[in-house]
Amino acid sequence: MTHYRTAPLPSPGLPAGIPYIIGNEAAERFSFYGMRAILVVFMTQYLLNTDGTLDSMAEAEAKGWYHLFVSAVYFTPLLGALLSDGLLGKYRTIIVLSLIYVLGHFALAVDHTRLGLAIGLGLIAAGAGGIKPCVSAHVGDQFGESNQHLLSRVFSWFYFSINLGAFSSMLATPWLMEHHGPALAFGVPGVLMLIATLVFWWGRKRFVHIPPAGMTFVREVLSGDGLRLLGRLSLIYLFIAVFWALFDQTGSAWVLQAQKMDHELFGINILPAQIQAANPLLVMLLIPLFSYKVYPAVSRLWTLTQLRKISIGMFVTVLAFSIPTWIQMQIDQGGVPSIGWQLLAYVVLTSAEVMVAITALEFSYTQAPRTMKSFVMAFFMMSIAVGNLFTSAVNFFIMNQDGSSKLAGAAYYEFFTLLMLVTAVLFILVARLYKGETFIQEER
C-alpha cells in the first residue's frame, strides 16, 4: 500500500475519503439492523426443523439467543483490531471481513433451520464485529491537526449515517418478513452489504491508509502505559456496559412487548418489529439538536465534559426504562395500551443514547495512542458485548423448563431499571476520578 497516502494532508476542510466511509456505513448498517430487527420474530414464529415443520423458540429462549448473538458481534471487534493494527491495516481488514459478512446474510436467506441460523449468525458476528473498530478508527485517521475541529461533527454524522441505514431497514425488513417470508427479508440486507463493500472499495484511493504497526502495536498494548490506559478505560466501560444491557433490549423484550399492544398509531398499523425504526429516526433528529443547540447552551452555564454527558445519559436511561415498566404493568392487568407509549419511551431512550453512545465513541478514539486506535475502539465495543452477555445470562437463568420466566411481566423491567439507577449513581464517583490524555493523528 506504498502508493496510498499514509498521513493526513494539512487542510482545514473535510477529508476526501469521508463520503465513501459514510456511504459504506449507511449501507452496512441497513444490512445489519435490517437483519437484527427481525431476528426475535424469526426465532419465535418462523424457525423450522430439518423436515420443514415449525420449531419456534419460547420468548425467554429467543431473548437469550438474541443477546448472545449481539454479544458475539461486539466481542469479535478484538479480532478485527488485532488484524488491523497488527497485520493487515484497516482497509484490507474491512474488505476481507465484509466478504465473510455477505456470506452470513446468504446463509440466513437460504437455510431457516437452527443450523442455518447458527452458521449465518456466526459469520455475521465475525464480519460485522470484526470491521466495527476499523471503520470508526478509519474515520479518525483521515483527520490531522488542522481539521481536528471537524472530528466531533463528523463522528456525529458518521453516527447519523448508521441510523439512516437502520431506520430504512427497520421499516423494510419487518414488512418483507410479514408479506414475503424470511428468504427475501434476510436476502435484501445481504445485497445491501455487498453494495457497502463495493462503495468502500471505490474510495480506496481517497483514504489515508495508516500502516499496521506489527509488533510495535503488540508492544504498545502490553507496555506499562498501554496496560494503564486499558485499566482506566475498562472501569469506564464496565459502567457503560449496563447502559447497553438495557438499550439493546429494544430489539428483543420491547418487540415482544409490542406484540401485546394496540398497533394502530395515527391511523397507521405498525408491525411490532417496525417500532424499532423510531430509534434511528429520532437519532437523526436529536443529533443536530444536541450538537448545535443543547450542548452549546449547557456549556455556557456548566463545563460539559465527555464523561459528564455520559453520566447524564445514564440517568435519562433510568427514566426511559420506567416507561416500558409501566406499560407492562398495564398489560399484566389485562390492558392493551397503545404502541404510542413505546414511542414515548424511544424518545427518552434515544436522548440517552445520544449522550452516552456518541460521546463514548468520540471519547474512545481520542483516548487512544496512534498505534492503538482500532484496539481501543474494539475495547469500547467490549462494553456492548458484556452488557448483552449479561442480559443473555439473565434471560437463560430466569427461563423455566416449560419456557416461562421467573421474572415474569413488569418484574423483568423493574429489575433492569433499578440496576441502571444504581449504576448511574456509582458512575458519578468514577467519572470524577478519571484522568486521561487526548491523542490526534499528526499531519505531514
Where are these regions (language model features)?
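Intracellular loop-helix junctions on the cytosolic face of multi-pass helical membrane proteins
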Residues: 1-21, 145-148, 152, 156, ...
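A gly/Pro-rich, aromatic-decorated transmembrane alpha-helix motif that marks the paired
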Residues: 36-37, 78-82, 163-179, 322-325, ...
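Short amphipathic helix-loop junctions that connect adjacent transmembrane helices
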Residues: 37-63, 252-273
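Central cavity-lining transmembrane alpha-helices of secondary-active solute carriers
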Residues: 63-85, 167, 277-292, 386
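Conserved MFS/SLC helix-loop-helix module at the cytosolic interface between two early adjacent transmembrane helices
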Residues: 76-100, 105-106
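Cytoplasmic membrane-interface "Motif A"-like loop-to-helix N-cap segments
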Residues: 86-98, 296-317
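C-terminal ends and interior cores of transmembrane alpha-helices
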Residues: 96-117, 312-334
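Intracellular juxtamembrane helix-capping segments at the cytosolic ends
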Residues: 130-146, 353-368
